[in-house]
Amino acid sequence: MNRQQNDLILQFAAVIIFFMVMVFGFSLFLAGHYTPGGGFVGGLLFASSLVIITIAFDIETMRKIFPLDFKILIGIGLVFCIATPIASWFLGKNFFTHVTFDIPLFILEPVHMTTAVFFDFGVLCAVVGTVMTIIISIGENE
């Protein structure tokens, strides 16, 4: 997929669509654990936005935008997915019981968080890493 493309309209539209899909994916990720959305759907949207950039430009351009190796991203996601239930277990709760806490912010009110956000973040990283590893391996063989 290392070819010169002169599709100016496609490239311009892809950049705009990239940001729109990323914002929508982030909002679905934050919608999270108990409502439609979460790590899997957000990860699919994040990966699809990177696929749009890959189609409009090439793999090297996409790697400049996201320089982290996607196989490492799969490992990071698995660490979050495994560490979240183990952390609640060490805090004296049952395995996979979510712990709630507040993050104090200086000017704003504290943000209420649960460990489900970290688990969903791990799922997001694993999904993005898996989808992009598959897409890149298919694209590099052509």
UniProtKB/Swiss-Prot annotation:
The chain crosses the membrane at residues 9-31, 35-57, 70-92, 116-138. GO terms for biological process: proton transmembrane transport; sodium ion transport. This is Na(+)/H(+) antiporter subunit B1. Pfam families: MnhB. Keywords: Antiport, Cell membrane, Hydrogen ion transport, Ion transport, Membrane, Sodium, Sodium transport, Transmembrane, Transmembrane helix, Transport. May form a heterooligomeric complex that consists of seven subunits: mnhA1, mnhB1, mnhC1, mnhD1, mnhE1, mnhF1 and mnhG1. One of its GO terms (molecular function) is monoatomic cation transmembrane transporter activity. Its main location: membrane. Mnh complex is a Na(+)Li(+)/H(+) antiporter involved in Na(+) and/or Li(+) excretion. Na(+)/H(+) antiport consumes a transmembrane electrical potential, and is thus inferred to be electrogenic. Does not transport K(+), Ca(2+) or Mg(2+).
